[in-house]
Amino acid sequence: MDNRVMFDYDRSAKILFVEDQWDIRTTQDVDAFFAEYAHFISTIGEKFWMVAHIDKLVIHADIAEYYGEVAREATSERLLGLARWGEDSVARMTLRTTAMKAKMPFDIYSSREEAVRAIEKMKAERPGSKA
């Protein structure tokens, strides 16, 4: 598998759509993965919501805790809310466990449409938010 992340930012909705395709085995893999995110996020220039497709994201168990720590740090300032989606049961289980360890949201939706609806609900529930 080629390690990459595909980004598509909907500026009017302030939603970053990502397609994660990465086999994360080492701390170096985690750092490289989040460096891709940091590079793209630096081009956005505003706080945003994110919908992530996780079917091709593999996080090996022995690196999951470090992944969670870095994920929390990497997104704490700019991310307004996150909804993940995927159909692959192994990817869903692995990411849910990792998110729980990192004390991050761990809901994973079955489709992109469900994830977008979850973001819209988060937007509506955010006090004073027009985002």
PLM regions: where:
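Amphipathic, Lys/Arg-enriched alpha-helical "gate/interface" segment within cytosolic domains
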Residues: M1-A131
